Amino acid sequence: MQYEVVLPAAGSGKRMGAGQNKLFLKLLKKPILIHTLEVFQQDPFCTGIWLAVKPEERIYIQELLDEYRITKVKGLPNGGAERQHSVHSCMKEMEQVDIVLVHDAARPFITHAIIANLVQSAHDFGAAIAGVRAKDTMKKVRNGVIEETVDRDSLWMIQTPQAFRFDLIVEAEDVAEKVGFLGTDEAMLVERLGHTVHIVESSYENVKMTTQEDLLFGEAILRKRALQLNE
């Protein structure tokens, strides 16, 4: 089932402390951004990629796209101050498609199998997001003091991609913009419309590159996958 994907790529990545867009940092000699883009470039069901970028980084990103032969990118609109604004910027330029995915550009380890499950779920139910079950004991804390232990069985750690029927995510984005609501993710905008969002079990490897420690973990994942391919 075909889809297009939006990748907000205009963030600052302050927690990485790299002094540059973290998406340009390399994992095994290749930029994080390219690792992520190649997942969708190589997926035959992906018909288009939209990258929201900083204007001052557009030329460099285009050079990367050319160097690594990423041909599915349909647009590089300006990113906004927040992720939600960047996604909305891309949505305004898209023509109608069946399914739209929104994915963190700093999550390069998503698999085609998980993507396919998300697209199917979004087709069936309208909205679906990737997530994994919480593994650690969870505590509710206020002012440095534990208030209660939360039931872990009902808790999921949410990832991306998040997948939606086109008309649903457009409506959710438009309503949020009109009332000035800023959500933490696209699913939250859809939830505000009263629409049910389904969850698709993902992988603990689908980590977001946020800190220097994540880079070490990311390189370990790449090496493990390379070994599996050669077995």
Curated annotation (Swiss-Prot):
**Annotated GO MF terms:** 2-C-methyl-D-erythritol 4-phosphate cytidylyltransferase activity
Give any single GO term for biological process: isopentenyl diphosphate biosynthetic process, methylerythritol 4-phosphate pathway
Please give the catalytic activity noted in the UniProt record: 2-C-methyl-D-erythritol 4-phosphate + CTP + H(+) = 4-CDP-2-C-methyl-D-erythritol + diphosphate
* Site residues, Transition state stabilizer: R15, K22
Q: Which Pfam families match?
A: IspD
Give the EC number: 2.7.7.60
Query: Which pathway is it part of?
Result: Isoprenoid biosynthesis; isopentenyl diphosphate biosynthesis via DXP pathway; isopentenyl diphosphate from 1-deoxy-D-xylulose 5-phosphate: step 2/6
Presence of keyword Nucleotidyltransferase: yes
- Role noted for this protein: Catalyzes the formation of 4-diphosphocytidyl-2-C-methyl-D-erythritol from CTP and 2-C-methyl-D-erythritol 4-phosphate (MEP).
Q: Which HAMAP family match?
A: IspD
Q: Which family does it belong to?
A: Belongs to the IspD/TarI cytidylyltransferase family. IspD subfamily.
Could you tell me what this protein is called? 2-C-methyl-D-erythritol 4-phosphate cytidylyltransferase
Q: List the source organism.
A: Lysinibacillus sphaericus (strain C3-41)
Give the classification, highest ranks.
Answer: Bacteria, Bacillati, Bacillota, Bacilli, Bacillales
- Gene name of the encoded protein: ispD
